[in-house]
């Protein structure tokens, strides 16, 4: 009787183990199917390839490509990189313009108010207006942003300023920025000064100003041009000597004067052509 009971217990134990093993296998199978379904429903999760990427099964391995095919692939990638950089640059310029636009509108409104005040009561142009006038023709959005930010600090100043106050304000305001230096050709001092002055001033300003304000013996113009702000001249000299230590002040001044003379000759040439047409 005892043997029969032991035999029944062994049989029950084996049956229980078989049932437990079967349930475990069933659960593992269900989990595997669930993971497979999840991978099909969400192809971009886990180790799935991102959009725009292709798996090694879809794309032929580089080792199997010929030399011509590799060159064509490299050329295509270079073109994509160039286009991406151009688009990135365009978007950055657009972003700068969007950031500057509200401030630019405010500055122009102030200029209109200043012009109306000058027409009604007379007086001298404020530093803010003169600074904007000199940088109006600069096409760089960064240049206009810098001009607006510099002139914004003086937006609350009165329309009419004394010459001494205006001169002191210009001296405090003028500073050559790093981005302005970065835009210039640094191969030779004359090329650097030409590019730097083109960034800092408009052609109209350079054509109507001289280095010292004194009349040159070789100049054909009867009128004496006003001198540039000497603080600005010293700033240009200092920046130039940092890049070209062997260049002295006299040479740099001569180069600045040469740039001013070149801008002066252009309007005269067009005036002579117009006079010939009239004759």
From Swiss-Prot:
Cross-referenced Pfam families: BEN
One GO-annotated biological process of the protein: positive regulation of neuron differentiation
Comp. bias (Polar residues): 1-15, 134-148
Listed Basic and acidic residues bias regions: 162-172
Coiled-coil intervals, chain numbering: 62-99
Keyword Coiled coil set for record: yes
Subcellular location: Nucleus
Record-level GO cellular component terms: nucleus
Role noted for this protein: Acts as a corepressor of recombining binding protein suppressor hairless (RBPJ) and inhibits Notch signaling in neural stem cells, thereby opposing their self-renewal and promoting neurogenesis.
Subunit field text: Interacts (via BEN domain) with RBPJ.
Full protein name: BEN domain-containing protein 6
């Amino acid at each position: 009787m005892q043997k029969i009971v032991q035999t029944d217990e062994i049989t029950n134990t084996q049956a229980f183990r078989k049932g437990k093993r079967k349930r475990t296998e069933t659960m593992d199978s269900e989990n595997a199917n669930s993971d497979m379904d999840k991978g099909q429903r969400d192809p971009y999760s886990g180790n799935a390839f991102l959009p725009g990427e292709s798996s090694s099964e879809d794309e032929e391995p580089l080792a199997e490509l010929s030399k011509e095919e590799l060159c064509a692939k490299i050329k295509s990638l270079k073109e994509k990189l160039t286009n991406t950089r151009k688009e990135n640059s365009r978007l950055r310029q657009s972003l700068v313009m969007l950031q500057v636009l509200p401030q630019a509108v405010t500055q122009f409104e102030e200029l209109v108010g200043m012009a109306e005040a000058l027409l009604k009561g007379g007086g001298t142009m404020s530093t803010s207006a003169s600074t904007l006038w000199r940088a109006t023709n600069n096409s760089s959005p960064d240049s206009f942003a810098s001009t607006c930010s510099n002139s914004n600090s003086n937006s609350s100043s009165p329309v009419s300023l004394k010459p001494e106050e205006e001169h002191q304000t210009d001296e405090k305001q003028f500073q050559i920025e790093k981005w302005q230096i970065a835009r210039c050709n640094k191969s030779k001092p004359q090329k650097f000064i030409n590019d730097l002055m083109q960034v800092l001033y408009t052609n109209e300003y350079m054509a109507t100003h001289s280095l010292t304000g004194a009349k040159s013996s070789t100049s054909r113009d009867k009128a004496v041009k006003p001198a540039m702000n000497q603080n600005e001249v010293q700033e240009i000299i200092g920046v130039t000597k940092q890049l070209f230590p062997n260049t002295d002040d006299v040479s740099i001044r001569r180069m600045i004067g040469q740039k001013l003379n070149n801008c002066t000759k252009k309007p005269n040439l067009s005036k002579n052509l117009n006079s010939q047409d009239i004759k």
